[in-house]
């Protein structure tokens, strides 16, 4: 996926598109390129199943609507076919936490805004799990003694493993998630949904605050 630090991303691209100059990309762009790869390089004509979690799950919806005659089945879990307003607002919050770092410099930083990345991780942890998750201390099943250990782990994970511009590039793609976005359906969401021919199993998440049953 573009922006993830492995494919073309703000920290891994040509100079005039690097860092804060990296273009905004949608899931339509991602799936269009994935389609070119598997059809032109690997000569694949049909896909038996597209599945994934979170943004990968969003891409499974996108595949099914963008190429309805190619995809036989999808199984997105903890994902949505269109990012909700609530989800969008949550992402604005974690983005604000990151960009408040004095080293952010509008994305033109000389060193990673580590304090902002840590803040991003700590704020995100409050959304990635539900009230019940914390009330029932389910974090102990993940190996954490208490909630502070979980918060610290999330903070350090983001500080050590993410480039800030990469992270915000993915967030922008997530916020723009809408299977009707692009030249095929021109923002007609209902038409895009009706175009899906793939057999579908939808798996919501019971333990987060933004991809529960009502959001998928």
Question: Which residue ranges define each predicted feature?
Answer:
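Short beta-strand/loop motif that positions the catalytic acidic residue
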Residues: 202-204
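Short alpha-helical scaffolding segments that buttress acidic/His motifs in well-ordered protein cores
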Residues: 124, 128, 167-174
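Active-site nucleophile elbow and catalytic-triad environment of alpha/beta-hydrolase enzymes
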Residues: 169-192
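Alpha/beta-hydrolase-fold enzymes
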Residues: 70-71, 75-157
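Short, proline-enriched alpha-helix->beta-strand connector loops that line the catalytic pocket
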Residues: 195-200
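Acidic catalytic loop of the alpha/beta-hydrolase fold
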Residues: 207-211
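Conserved small/polar residues in nucleotide/adenosyl-binding loops
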Residues: 214-216
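Gly/Pro-rich cap/lid or specificity-loop segments adjacent to the active site
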Residues: 1-58, 65, 69-82, 86-91
């Amino acid at each position: 996926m573009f922006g993830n630090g492995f494919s073309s991303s703000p920290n891994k691209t040509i100079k005039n598109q690097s860092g804060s100059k990296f273009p905004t990309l949608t899931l339509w762009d991602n799936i269009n390129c994935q389609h070119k790869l598997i059809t032109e390089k690997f000569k694949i004509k049909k896909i038996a199943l597209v599945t994934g979690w979170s943004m990968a799950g969003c891409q499974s919806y996108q595949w099914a609507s963008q190429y309805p005659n190619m995809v036989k089945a999808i199984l997105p879990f903890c994902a949505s076919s269109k990012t909700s307003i609530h989800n969008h607002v949550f992402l604005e919050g974690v983005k604000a936490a990151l960009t408040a770092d004095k080293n952010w410099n509008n994305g033109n930083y000389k060193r990673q805004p580590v304090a902002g990345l840590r803040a991003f991780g700590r704020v995100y942890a409050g959304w990635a799990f539900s009230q019940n998750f914390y009330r029932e201390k389910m974090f102990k099943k993940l190996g954490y003694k208490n909630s502070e250990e979980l918060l610290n782990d999330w903070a350090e994970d983001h500080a050590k493993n993410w480039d800030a511009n990469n992270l915000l590039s993915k967030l922008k793609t997530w916020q723009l998630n809408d299977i009707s976005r692009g030249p095929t359906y021109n923002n007609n969401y209902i038409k895009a949904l009706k175009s899906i021919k793939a057999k579908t199993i939808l798996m919501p998440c019971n333990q987060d605050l933004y991809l529960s049953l009502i959001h998928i």
